[in-house]
């Protein structure tokens, strides 16, 4: 029997597919729909210290090859999502979950994480170091010194399982520099990648979204090659205890297969989930299982990270 089960840290999941933060996870109702689907888990909307309305609309648009968005982290506040996942973990039949959070400053991030540390929540936290769509707030993970300082502070008190959501990197030197920092800390996972920041999509003679004069994060088909490169680069460089989550351009079982082949232990779906809804998890799981069966693979470990190079 072909299995798409996987593990992150000590947490077992019956399927490697899940949503990406920001997509189909704003409300409790949306999260419950993911929970009831074929997905192995869900990640919440990135929760900030206080609720946020986000950027003015229109702030999302589908395109022929994916999507562009400048949402600006709209959310109900981290406490809303913390309450949901803490309550759900009381049910032994519940899946394990990921709580996505970030502050608008390093101080706010620490306030949030200290509250989670003191809470009853025992699941995974995904620290979002990579949102490209908050005006005036740079993507922290591109500042290696600031990232190192923040992680050093966090792990001086935070003892629960925590991973990081990364922006795409484009230079081999940056893969090396980032990995050297991440390997110093007991991270549970690294999620590669968030949307490619500050793309521009034009319809006739006008931009298609309002914030930032049309600049926004690019997702979908556009970013799969970049996502695969980041997944494989960090799979090669990070400690084996730091699992990789692959995100970007996944709309078929073949796409998920390629992420796993590059080293991903789990695969998140964003743009295609937004377009198709939670039923997508059943379809992509079946497509992935069919590929595995055709190739004679019984588990993800049979091919995870086994990308072949030209001789």
From Swiss-Prot:
Catalytic-site annotation from UniProt: 131 (nucleophile)
Keywords of the record: Cytoplasm, Flavoprotein, FMN, Oxidoreductase, Pyrimidine biosynthesis
CDD domains assigned: DHOD_1A_like
Binding sites annotated in the UniProt record for FMN: 45-46, 128, 165, 193, 220, 248-249, 270-271
Residues annotated as binding substrate: 45, 69-73, 128, 194-195
Cofactor annotation remark: Binds 1 FMN per subunit.
Catalytic activity: (S)-dihydroorotate + fumarate = orotate + succinate
Cofactor: FMN
Pfam families: DHO_dh
Highest taxon of the lineage: Bacteria
Localization in the cell: Cytoplasm
MF (Gene Ontology): dihydroorotate dehydrogenase (fumarate) activity
Family membership noted in the UniProt record: Belongs to the dihydroorotate dehydrogenase family. Type 1 subfamily.
Function: Catalyzes the conversion of dihydroorotate to orotate with fumarate as the electron acceptor.
Entry protein name: Putative dihydroorotate dehydrogenase A (fumarate)
Gene: pyrD
């Amino acid at each position: 029997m072909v299995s798409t089960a996987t593990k992150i840290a000590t947490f077992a999941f019956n399927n490697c597919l899940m949503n990406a933060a920001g997509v189909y996870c704003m409300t409790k109702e949306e999260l419950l729909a993911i929970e009831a689907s074929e997905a192995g888990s869900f990640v919440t909307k990135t929760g900030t210290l206080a609720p946020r309305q986000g950027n003015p609309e229109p702030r999302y648009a589908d395109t022929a090859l994916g999507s562009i968005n400048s949402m600006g982290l709209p959310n109900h506040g981290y406490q809303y999502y913390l309450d949901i996942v803490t309550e759900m973990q009381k049910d032994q039949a519940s899946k394990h979950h990921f709580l996505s959070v970030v502050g608008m400053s390093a101080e706010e991030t620490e306030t949030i994480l200290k509250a989670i540390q003191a809470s009853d929540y025992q699941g995974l936290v995904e620290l979002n170091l990579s949102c490209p769509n908050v005006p005036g707030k740079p993507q922290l993970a591109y500042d290696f010194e600031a990232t190192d300082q923040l992680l050093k502070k966090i792990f001086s008190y935070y003892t629960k399982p925590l991973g990081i959501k990364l922006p795409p990197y484009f230079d081999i030197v940056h893969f090396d520099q980032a990995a050297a920092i991440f390997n110093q800390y007991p991270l549970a996972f690294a999620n590669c990648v968030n949307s490619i920041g500050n793309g521009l999509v034009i319809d006739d003679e006008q931009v298609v979204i309002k914030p930032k004069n049309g600049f926004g994060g690019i997702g979908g088909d556009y970013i799969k090659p970049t996502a695969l490169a980041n997944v494989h680069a960090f799979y090669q460089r990070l400690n084996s205890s730091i699992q990789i989550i692959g995100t970007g351009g996944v709309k078929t079982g073949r796409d998920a297969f390629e992420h796993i082949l590059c080293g991903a232990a789990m695969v998140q779906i964003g743009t295609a989930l937004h377009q198709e809804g939670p039923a997508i998890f059943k379809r992509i799981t079946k497509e992935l299982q069919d590929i595995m069966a055709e190739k004679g693979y019984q588990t993800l470990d049979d091919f995870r990270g086994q990308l072949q190079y030209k001789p």
